A protein has these predicted regions:
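Metallocofactor- and cofactor-centric catalytic cores in central/energy metabolism, strongly enriched
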Residues: 18
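C-terminal functional extensions of proteins
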Residues: 86-142
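Glycine-rich phosphate-binding loop
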Residues: 26-75
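Glycine-rich phosphate/diphosphate-binding loop of Rossmann-like nucleotide-binding domains
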Residues: 1-11
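Conserved nucleotide-sensing/catalytic segment adjacent to the nucleotide-binding pocket
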Residues: 23
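Hydrophobic/aromatic beta-strand patches that form the interior of the parallel beta-sheet core
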Residues: 10-12, 39-41, 84-89
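Short, flexible loop segments at boundaries between secondary-structure elements
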Residues: 70-93
């Protein structure tokens, strides 16, 4: 399939801050400074208040991302990064009960993440590459 008109896109998968020693805010700030993107799309798992939503919805927001880290004052948003920030995610956990230090996840979490991430990736790729057909996007992402 010939592919023309691909828009430039950069991506990173920062992982868990405990393994890198850097917070998501630090990594995103450095990336924005180095790449100078038109916008930033942040994908993360989300915490739900209702069990019925776990793995059954996809949420998008143009107000940025509020990482569940100890540094609650640092949010990934346009005010902090200087570019529009779109957050996308799938609710995959919820707090067990008020005041408890436990979280609940779906029993089929691996399946929820595999299917949900594929759907979310397809939607983001389609939004970022509107000139490409679905067949071309499938071919590119293999």
């Amino acid at each position: 399939l010939p592919v023309r008109g691909i828009r430039p896109v950069a991506a990173i998968a920062p992982g868990v801050s405990g393994s890198t020693g850097l917070t998501l805010c630090q990594l995103a700030g450095a990336m924005v400074e180095a790449v100078r993107p038109a916008a930033l799309i942040c994908v993360d798992s989300l915490c739900s208040t209702e069990g019925a939503r776990l793995g059954r919805s996809i949420q998008f927001s143009d107000t940025g991302l509020h990482p569940a880290q100890a540094d609650h004052a640092r949010h990934l948003d346009a005010g902090m990064l200087g570019v529009p920030v779109v957050a996308a995610g799938i609710p995959t956990l919820m707090e067990a009960e008020e005041g408890a230090d436990l979280v609940v996840t779906p029993r089929a979490l691996d399946s929820v993440i595999a299917h949900g991430s594929a759907l979310l990736a397809a939607a983001i790729n389609r939004a970022l590459q509107p000139r490409l057909s679905v067949a071309q996007l499938c071919w590119l992402t293999g």
